[in-house]
A protein has these predicted regions:
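Secondary-structure boundary motif
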Residues: 38, 42, 71-77, 96, ...
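A generic structural motif
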Residues: 76-79, 155
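Catalytic-core regions built around general acid/base machinery
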Residues: 64-77, 103
Length: 176
């Protein structure tokens, strides 16, 4: 992009968060790109670069959370499962990049399930797949809509704001 403003315009009006979330829900990337190319042909190279250069856009892990995850894994007292809104097509690249994802006992990727958080069915799916009892399962997420949906199913929750806040709340829950 020629400027930060041009990039922000593109992300706000062309490859929007809402558009990206549809791929997290299972829509194939080629189909998603075609929809935008029909509407915005003058942005062809940028639209194709959105997923074509996906790994360049990935941020790094939140290190404090990775440290907490590692501590939980080492204690071996609780099963660790991940429920992520992510495209099935970009997930393999993400797994390759972040070794800590292998520490989970199971991962449910929304794009593979054709549904995404906060759809309550995806919380049921992870509980059913891994034999988790909602009342004794803790769900941590940074999105309040996702927290509310998990609570409707009866999961315990922590609304993530920072690693320190999460660790404090986690220690309180685990001490009960």
């Amino acid at each position: 992009f020629q400027s930060r403003e041009a990039m922000e315009y593109f992300l706000a009006h062309v490859c929007t968060s809402e558009w990206n979330e549809e791929q997290d829900g299972g829509r194939p990337i080629r189909e998603a790109e075609s929809l935008l190319l029909d509407q915005f042909p003058h942005y062809k190279s940028e639209i194709l670069a959105f997923y074509g250069r996906w790994t360049e856009m990935l941020g790094g892990p939140i290190h404090g959370t990775v440290d907490i995850l590692q501590g939980l894994k080492e204690k071996k007292q609780h099963g660790l499962y991940a429920l992520t809104n992510w495209s099935a097509e970009t997930w393999p690249k993400t797994e390759e990049r972040f070794a800590f994802l292998s520490w989970f006992d199971g991962i449910l990727v929304s794009g593979k399930e054709n549904m995404k958080k906060p759809d309550v069915r995806i919380y049921r799916a992870i509980c059913d797949r891994y034999g988790l009892e909602p009342a004794s399962t803790l769900f941590i997420d940074d999105n309040h809509r996702n927290i509310e949906a998990a609570q409707r199913l009866g999961l315990q929750t922590i609304h993530f704001a920072s690693p320190a806040q999460m660790e404090t709340e986690l220690n309180i829950i685990l001490a009960q």
